[in-house]
């Protein structure tokens, strides 16, 4: 399975000519959706979902499937795709990928902002994308897509999460708000934890791909 990082919080998975995209929000490149058969969306914030680009993707591929929570689905009424609502504990198959849903809520953010629903996705029992939360996956996770910068988190929480999950490999997500100096700090912290756990932990640049075992 091939994993490609796009801007900020978007990743693309490819397997046997099937394409699955997670969280193609406003800070990612729209080309992430080229040829996509299915899209997973963790929550409704604009940096994770952008309705107009999903509409264009659905117009290009009328069989496009979108799997998400009820809060996101309510915002996509004008998108001509097959929209499926999922919740914590659900499992489903889409475009040849097996997916398990893990988690229910976004991490607390601003005290005056409501907490929205957030679902994480474990794809093919290989890649876990928690969305905007440090949700324990509850199972062994070979590849973790770990949030590394956000208004709702501290860097120390990222490290604690890596130590809790103990993946074989971890790649940065949710890093699009950082300048070069901030990205350098992320690289340093991931490098330190990589050395400590003797596991691959690093930041993928936008457009960079890795082949998973």
Where are these regions (language model features)?
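Active-site metal-binding motif and surrounding structural segment of the metallo-beta-lactamase
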Residues: 26-68, 142-145
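Core dinuclear metal-dependent hydrolase active-site scaffold
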Residues: 1-34, 85-140, 151-157, 205-213
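A short helix->loop->beta-strand "cap" motif at the edges of active sites that frequently abuts
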Residues: 60-65, 165-169, 197-199
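Binuclear metal-ion centers of metallo-dependent hydrolases, dominated by the metallo-beta-lactamase
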Residues: 1-4, 77-95, 159, 169-213
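Short, Asp-centered acidic motifs that coordinate Mg2+ and/or phosphate
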Residues: 19-20, 38, 143, 169
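Alpha-helix capping/helix-boundary segments
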Residues: 46, 72-73, 90, 135, ...
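Metallo-beta-lactamase
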Residues: 119-192
């Amino acid at each position: 399975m091939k994993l490609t990082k796009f801007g900020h919080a978007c990743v693309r998975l490819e397997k046997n000519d099937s394409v699955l995209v997670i969280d193609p929000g406003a800070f990612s490149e729209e080309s992430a959706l080229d040829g996509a058969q299915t899209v997973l969306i963790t929550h409704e914030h604009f940096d994770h979902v952008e309705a107009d680009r999903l509409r264009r993707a659905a117009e290009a591929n009328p069989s496009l499937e979108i799997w998400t929570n009820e809060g996101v689905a309510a915002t996509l009424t004008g998108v001509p795709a097959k929209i499926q609502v999922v919740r914590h504990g659900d499992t489903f198959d889409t475009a040849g990928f097996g997916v398990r849903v893990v988690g229910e809520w976004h991490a607390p953010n601003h005290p005056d902002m409501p907490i929205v629903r957030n679902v994480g996705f474990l794809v093919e029992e290989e890649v876990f994308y928690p969305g905007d939360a440090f949700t324990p996956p509850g199972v062994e996770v070979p590849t973790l897509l770990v949030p590394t910068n956000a208004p709702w988190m501290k860097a120390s929480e990222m490290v604690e999460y890596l130590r809790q999950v103990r993946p074989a490999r971890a790649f940065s997500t949710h890093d699009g708000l950082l300048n070069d100096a901030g990205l350098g700090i992320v690289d340093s912290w991931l490098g330190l934890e990589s050395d400590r756990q003797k596991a691959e932990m690093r930041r993928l640049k936008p457009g960079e791909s890795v082949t998973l075992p």
